[in-house]
Amino acid sequence: VVATLSKEQFKEVTYLVESTLSGVQQNSKSNYYASFFDRDSIQQDSKTISCSGRGQTLLFSKDRRDLVLRHYRRGGFFGKLVKDSFFIFEKNAHRAFDEFKLLEYMLSKGLPVPKPVIAREIKGFFSVTQDIVIERLNGYKDLSYVISKRELTETEYTNIGKTISLFFKENILHTDLNIRNILINEEGRVAIIDFDK
């Protein structure tokens, strides 16, 4: 569901939300949707965890759900100049909405990815800033953490290969696949995250 809820100070705020959130009463949608992205309020909660990385990721809980808030930032040299603004004419100007839709599609195909909850775009005259909130995959650790603690089992290696092949079979190519966005749990189940490129 797409909802454009506010236009002020030459900026337009648009949300893409999962169906369960679209049932919020119209007069309270704007504040409710915005609360998912209120970093100051979220960080005041003692249970919130701030993660390192370019995306400024926060792990938090809301409405009895464990969630991940990620702010989209640029990388590379250009990212040092512009940081988190994407020009509206760029190919990747709508990363948050693109990732949201891709996650929904992959879930419909039974692929092991997190569920998208809500995404936001704030548009100015020529640029857009973006955020996304997804459900946290509890019990999973990224591969870089796991291999820093122990060796992988043969079964885990096999499961990683099989999981990646599922995405290839659906013609989905993760352009930044690395050990930080391959997750594994204690049962050896594998999931893939960060489809923002």
Model region roles, listed by residue range:
Residues 155-163:
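Conserved alphaE helix
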Residues 1-51, 63-64, 187-191:
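Regulatory N- and C-terminal appendages and interdomain linkers associated
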Residues 172-179:
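Catalytic-loop of the protein kinase fold
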Residues 33-141, 165, 169-170:
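Conserved ATP-binding subdomain of kinase catalytic cores across diverse folds
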Residues 71, 136, 177, 195-197:
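Generic detector of well-ordered alpha-helical packing
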Residues 142-151:
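AlphaC helix of the protein kinase catalytic domain
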Residues 180-197:
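Catalytic activation segment of kinase domains across protein kinase-like and atypical kinase folds
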